Amino acid sequence: MAAACICQPNLLEINVSDGPLDMIRKKRKIQQPQLRPPLRENKCQPHFSVRKVNQSYIISLHKEITCQLIAEIVKQKLSRIWEKVYIPSYELISDKDGNQIYVEQSVDENRLTSEIMEKLDPNNIDIEAIEILFDDYHLELSRLTNGIIISSANDHFYREFSFNNIIDDNFKICGTSMSADSFDKIYGVMWIEVPFNGNGLQNDSAVNRVSTSHNQIEELNDIEQEIRAFNISRSNQESIIKKEVSRRLNGR
């Protein structure tokens, strides 16, 4: 996967809404309801940032690729190819009473792990993980503001992004990639391109100031992030495959 479709652009100020703007609370002649505690943050929800690149806004969504997700993908794929990569061999030996029996020969687990890694291809596993993360994400043009709405039913995610420049309606997903933070967590990244025509709705001198979610992932160079994330993911995959190979060989 190539991460270089976006140069190092400036971050900018936008307006972000957590829910539909056309919901109006009606007055009711009943006692006031008790205050409820705030909803617990959904850890599946993505971090996001917005950048301006030439004549487009680029919205970046980041979601963590957990070891659990990688393990599920690896085990599924390994089940499909196991009988092709592992073909047991037997040696005919005689016991102390002269009886001939077949004994399964030992297997080089490291060699088998390397062969499986090559057949599964770490890149394909990363791509599948990112597809799963953003599988039900939906993009639509806002009817109330100059912006777009990004939502996900699975992640209970709803964000409305409104912009100062008048946008075109041909926004699209322009690519996916990976990134890594300083704690060696890896993230799937989805980029959404929102073109604008250059006409501003208002004179805003703060267009290049930062405005992102409070949990924004540390900003590093995109290509460096992807390379680092790939290396971490490859190490995680190899560890998972080794454990699964050992389990299958010793538990067969």
UniProtKB/Swiss-Prot annotation:
It is found in: Nucleus. One of its GO terms (cellular component) is nucleus. GO terms for molecular function: protein-folding chaperone binding. It comes from the Eukaryota. Its main location: nucleus. Keywords: Nucleus, Transcription, Transcription regulation. GO terms for biological process: intracellular protein transport; protein folding; protein localization to nucleus. Signal peptide: none annotated. Involved in the curing of prion [URE3]. Nuclear localization of this protein may suggest a role in transcription regulation, so it might exert an effect on [URE3] through known prion-curing chaperones or BTN2. This is Curing of [URE3] protein 1. It comes from Saccharomyces cerevisiae (strain ATCC 204508 / S288c). The gene is CUR1.
